[in-house]
Structures are given as C-alpha cells and as structure tokens.
From Swiss-Prot:
Keyword list, A-Z: Glycosidase, Hydrolase, Repeat, Signal
Top-level enzyme category: hydrolase
Alphabetical list of Pfam families matching this protein: Beta-barrel_GLAA-B_II, Pect-lyase_RHGA_epim
An example Gene Ontology molecular-function term: alpha-galactosidase activity
Record's function text: Alpha-galactosidase that specifically removes branched alpha-1,3-linked galactose residues present in blood group B antigens. Has no activity toward linear alpha-1,3-linked galactose residues.
Protein name according to UniProt: Alpha-1,3-galactosidase A
Gene3D superfamilies: Single-stranded right-handed beta-helix, Pectin lyase-like
Organism: Streptomyces avermitilis (strain ATCC 31267 / DSM 46492 / JCM 5070 / NBRC 14893 / NCIMB 12804 / NRRL 8165 / MA-4680)
Gene: glaA
PbH1 repeats mapped onto the chain: 342-364, 460-482, 483-505, 516-537, 573-611
Upper lineage: Bacteria, Bacillati, Actinomycetota, Actinomycetes, Kitasatosporales
Amino acid sequence: MAHGCSGGAMSRFVFLGVALALLGGATSPAAAAPRVTPVVVDVDDYGADPTGRTDSTPAVAAALRHAKSVDRPVRIVFSKGTYQLYPERAETRELYMSNTVGADQRYRDKKIGLLVEDMHDVTVDGGGAKLVHHGLQTAFASIRSTDVTFQNFSFDYAAPEVIDATVATTGVTDGHAYRVLKIPAGSPYRVNGTHITWLGETSPATGQPYWSGVDGLQYTQIHDPEAQRTWRGDNPLFNDVAAVTDLGGRRIRIDYTTAARPADAGLVYQMRLIERTEPGAFIWESKNVTMRSMNAYYLQSFGVVGQFSENISIDKVNFAPDPRSGRSTASFADFVQMSGVKGKVSITRSLFDGPHDDPINIHGTYLEVVGKPGPSTLTLAYKHPQTAGFPQFAPGDEVEFATKRTMTPLADAHAQVTAVDGPSGMDHTKPLTTMTVTFDRPVPAGVETGGTVVENITATPSVVISGNVFRNVPTRGILVTTRKPVLITGNRFDGMSMASIYVSADAYQWYESGPVADLTIRGNSFTRPSGPVIFVEPTNQVIDPATPVHHNISVEHNSFDIGDVTVVNAKSVGGFAFTGNTVRRLDGADHPPYTSPLFVFHGSSGIRIARNHYDKGLNTSVVTD
C-alpha cells in the first residue's frame, strides 16, 4: 500500500486509481463513481518512534504536513506501539477557546501534539498505539477541516497537572497524628522542610519543570475508591504540619502538631492548579468530526472543546484513567465542552469516569449589549473571563435578542447578521472581548445596554447522548442548553455529586445559552444520585409562568434508585411531563419514610405526572409556587 513518501510511487498510485475509475465508468456509464481509496501516510516513515524511546513530535508533524499536501482522502497511521510527544517541537498556534483562559495573553500560544488543519477527508488511525504527551499541550486538534476521524488510539500525559495523593495509612506516634501518602508515578515532587513542591516533569530543552506548585495547590476534590464516589471538599493534608518526610518509593509521611488520628485512610485527595491553559483536544471551524474507539486516559488543563463546528460525534471513547497508572483523575476539568456547535452532536457508548468538572456541557454563549453605534448595529461583549477572543457570529447567522431579567425573547426578536468586526480566534490585533455586529434590519425596540443579551441561534445543535456511563463525578453529569431536539437515553448515572442532568440558560454568571424547546430524557438509570436529580435552573430574575424560559421537557421510562432527595426541581418551564418512571428507595421500606418531596416546580405550567411506580415511604408530593 502506498505511503506517500515517494513521488514516483505516488504518481503510480494515483494513475492506477484513475485507470480503475475509467474502467468502471466504461462498463457502467450510469454507475456512481467508486469511493477513492485513501492515500496512507505512515508516521513511522517520517521517523516516528513506536518504541517510545525518542521524541516523535517532529516526525508526526512532518507526516501531517505531507498528508495535507495530498489532494485526495488520506489515512495517517501509527504502529501498535508507544509514541512520546513533547511540546518543544509541536505545532504552535495562537488560539482562543471557550471556557478556558479567555483573553489572558500569557496563554495565547497553544502547543498541539497532533494537528489536522485545513484538511479534508482525513482519518487519523492509531492502530492501537498509545500517545504519551509531555508538558502542557493539546493532545490533538481539528481546525478548519472537514470529514475528520480520530480513532483506535489511547492518549495520556506523562505528568498530569493533577496530583492524586492516596492516604495509604494514618496513625498516632508520641501523641502526634500522621498520614502516609502514596503518590502515582508521573507526579515528581521535592520535600522542602514542612512543604512539598510538586514538579510537573522536567523539560529536556530547558531543564526546568513544565509546571510546579506547593502543598495542596489551588483546588481539591476527594475520591473514595471503595465507595466509588468523588466530591469537592477541603484539603486537610497540609494543616498543622510538624514535619514532612520522603520515605522513598513514592511515599511521603506528614506528621502533625495535632493528636487525633486522621479518619481518611484510603481516600484520594486530587489536587491541582486552576488555570485552564489549553484544551485537552480542540475542534474548531470544522465539519463532520468523529472521535471513535479511543482511550482518553487524561485531558491536560481542560477537556475536548468543540467550538463553532458542525456535526461532532464521540463514540466508544473511554474517558477514564489508565487502570495501570495508580491515578483516579482523567481530566483537569470537563470531559466534553461543546460551545456554539451546529448540526448534530452525538455522544454514544462512552465512559465518563474521573473528571474535575462536568463530563458533558453543551451550550452557546450569550453576548451582552454594551453599545449601540447605529440603528442596525450593536457592540457586544463577552462577560465571563474564561471565554473571549474568538468569533461568535458570521454573516448569514440568525440571532435572538433576549432580556436578561426575564431570559425571554424580545418582541420581534430575530435578525440576520450582515457584518462582523471582532476577534478572529487566531490573533490579538483586535479587542478580544468585544465585537461590533451589524444586522439586516434595525435592532428591535427594547434592546438595552447592559440589559439585553444576544445568542447565535444558527450555532445550536440537535443532541443525542446515548448508552454512556457516568461515575466518580464531583459535579453534574450532563449540562445541555440548546433549542434543537435533545435526546438523552439509555445512560447510566452512578453516584453523581450534584444534579445528574442540569439545564440552565445563564445570562448572569457563565453566560452559557440558551433555552431548551424539545428535551427528552428516556430510559436512563439514576443510582445513588444527589438531589435534585434533574435540575432546571435558568437565571431569570423575573419569573412568570405565562412566559417560561424552557419548554417541552419529557422524563419518561427512567429508573431512579434514590436516598432522601428530590428527583425533579424545575424553574420556568412550560410543559413538563414525568411519565412511566420507576422511583425506588435505596434503603428499603423498613426504614423511616423519606421527607424530601420528589417534585418541586417554580413558575412553571403544563406539568403532567402520571403512570409512575413509587416504592412505599417516598414523599410523592408535588410542590409548586
């Protein structure tokens, strides 16, 4: 099979393909043209090292550059080995993305280990390879490309920007409490007196660590491997420290001035910094992008960001730590964040285990009106510091104007964009937090500076989330706010620490848009959930049942195995059905009855609750106001 390394071989390959096509056409003039056989580009032919002994970054970049020059479908293939990818010679691009570091110029240049850019009909097939990324970099990206598939490989980071410290033992010696921590390989550290400095792997180029931090870093969550639960909480490891001793073998003893024996043996303290300096993977201005049959063992600094793209599919991807690593964290923050995507988002048959934020978040962005330079023109601004620097609108897009206080559309609320002057997503020559947008008609009456937000409703997807498993999640399971049809079906949620499914629409904090109009939650299982299990909470300050924010939510044929929690808490919904569901108690009917009402509604109408099965001892009250 041709590998695209020899010009002569390539010419013969192309000629043979043309000849076969002509022969097929001669025998059947009306037949459709056969699919063009893709050119195969093997990264090993460019010097990539599947033994994992040397840096494969330059070779992988060279293979991708060659693949880009091939004017036909292409498969980029790896051997079934281990490839090391360092950031020093990775492709570098100035990029801005949603929910990361906004316009912060310290982080504008992103290193990308595997970059598909301005390409069409390309498959990156790992063939069972493992890609090990070093330092702070994005594992892979698709930028301005179409028909892109990433498949059949695992990726991990040699030194994750998270420390998973397991409390191996606790005790008391001479009246002083102590803990012994076990630290996974890939988390270098140095003991300095009564402190620990965490060192994020040494760069071979500079001799300095890629990142560093002290003691509990900036954020902690706690994982209980036995109970299979993870939650956000305080970090007691570095309080009242008397001494820190490196015992060797990646074990650290911390002695305390206090006397009470710590009661947290077996727990894992997952500690990290808070700057989301780059996404783990990035899909931007691309169409028909698929991630399939992959192990995402860790996502550095953030998750997979899909941004202003069309049709994204994630199928059979294990977002979970490598079981051989000794780690319990698989993402610095979210696993999947879809921002301003159109077409269809499909997330199926995947595992979400061990994030530091929400596994799936699908939303748009509200831009706030900050100026009216003309009758048909507005100045709009990003309002959350983590999101800035990239375009939100293009000529031809349809927008909707909404009032912040009510979160409902203005009268005559839609217009079409005709011109945009704002950030490009790739450079800092223009202001990164504001843009001027011109529409095809005068802006509607009622648009107010500081009181109106604008959403790009062209860049909203239909969504299918099916057949997935969510566990060891410290936050919500799924966040979704899109006006297109959403189906959440056949998923298993176990031990969520916040709402399993959360629907917001937020014009006050995160500015994540917008309303849902057709949401079906069907055939899922919710086990050991926190309450409320399904939480609808738009940020409207004025609540009027006659003008709800969200519409047409159906919860049907699901099973809920719960403690004493509320199943549904919904605000500002017009049309909510809860039918054919089974709600069971976790502790059995011989225990005292639960007191939490199963259903709470605020400012909602069209509520239908019917044909459900409830265990005895549940509070089936429906609370409305």
